[in-house]
């Protein structure tokens, strides 16, 4: 038994003896002691690092930038490999918009401002990619892909229905409706240029049909949300039809063809609204009939019967016949 030694020799001997007992066989005593020292240093370093993580972190310049850009929270997400290859980035991002909106709708009563902005920004982004004038040819989507796109838009609008009457959703819906009307002219122009250059137009034509479908979808939501905004958007369509009819008389055959096709696209949107079983939608569309009635009256006054027979197959005459067929008899008289 060792007794207390003020010089510490007894403690040193005890430690030395413990080291000798624990030292692995075949290992030099000096190397073993160095390894023990390194282990103690590593442990102290880990404890010191852990204590710094618990201390409040001072704000950095990056934090200030994030605050100024309205980013309220940064979440570090673990890297997650995709389970399958992304075949089409545009559809993938549109699907993300759909899934985010679906999740928000299931977990909360109403949508937050950022959720609404994220949704409509995603819709605008997708539509912009479908009518990029820099691309001679759009992506060729098969029937199943187009059905998927239509379904995504339909369900997104269904998720938005509960918030359709909110000022932000209403404003963005009208903006989207105006944008789709612009896309029709852009797409018709691209199709005409592609046809002249011998480039395919089938994929563009499919998207043209999709724009008509989407605009009618927007009208259905506005019919539920705001009759006033619905009437304004319908008025925009009819006024565009009037402009198209005017350009159909242009001396340039390319301009006549372009605006004739645009007239038909707008008519394909407007007249189903006029003849709709939705009383709200039909009533709103009927308030714009006067503009079309004036087109017929003015054209018949400017063209006598002899000239009308000579130009029976001209663009204005064909459009005039179409207008008379699509309007109610009481609207023509």
Swiss-Prot record:
The keyword Transcription regulation does not apply. GO terms for cellular component: cytosol; linear element; nucleus. It holds the Pfam family Mei4. Its main location: cytoplasm. Keywords: Chromosome partition, Cytoplasm, Meiosis, Nucleus. GO terms for biological process: chromosome segregation; meiotic DNA double-strand break formation; reciprocal meiotic recombination. This is Meiotic recombination protein rec24. It comes from Schizosaccharomyces pombe (strain 972 / ATCC 24843). The gene is rec24.
């Amino acid at each position: 038994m060792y007794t207390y030694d003020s010089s510490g020799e007894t403690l040193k001997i005890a430690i030395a003896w413990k080291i000798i007992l624990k030292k692995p066989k075949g290992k030099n005593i000096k190397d073993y002691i160095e390894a023990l020292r390194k282990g103690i240093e590593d442990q102290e370093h880990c404890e010191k690092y852990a204590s710094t993580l618990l201390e409040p972190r001072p704000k950095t310049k990056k934090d200030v930038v994030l605050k100024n850009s309205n980013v309220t929270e940064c979440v570090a997400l673990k890297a997650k490999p995709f389970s399958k290859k992304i075949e089409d980035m545009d559809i993938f991002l549109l699907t993300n918009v759909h899934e985010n909106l679906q999740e928000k709708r299931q977990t909360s009563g109403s949508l937050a401002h950022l959720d609404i902005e994220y949704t409509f920004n995603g819709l605008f982004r997708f539509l912009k990619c479908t009518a990029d004038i820099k691309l001679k040819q759009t992506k060729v989507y098969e029937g199943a892909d187009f059905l998927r796109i239509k379904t995504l838009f339909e369900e997104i609008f269904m998720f938005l229905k509960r918030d359709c009457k909110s000022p932000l959703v209403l404003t963005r819906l009208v903006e989207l409706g105006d944008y789709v009307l612009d896309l029709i002219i852009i797409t018709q122009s691209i199709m005409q240029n592609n046809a002249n250059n011998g480039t395919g137009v089938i994929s563009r034509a499919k998207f043209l049909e999709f724009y008509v479908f989407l605009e009618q979808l927007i009208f259905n939501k506005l019919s539920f949300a705001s009759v006033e905004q619905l009437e304004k958007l319908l008025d925009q369509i009819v006024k565009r039809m009037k402009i198209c009819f005017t350009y159909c008389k242009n001396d340039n055959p390319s301009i006549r063809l372009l605006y004739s096709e645009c007239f038909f696209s707008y008519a394909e949107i407007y007249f189903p609204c006029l003849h709709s079983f939705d009383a709200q939608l039909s009533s709103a569309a009927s308030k714009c009939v006067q503009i079309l009635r004036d087109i017929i009256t003015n054209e018949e006054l400017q063209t006598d019967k002899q000239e009308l027979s000579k130009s029976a197959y001209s663009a204005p005459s064909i459009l005039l016949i179409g207008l008379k067929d699509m309007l109610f008899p009481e609207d023509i008289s």
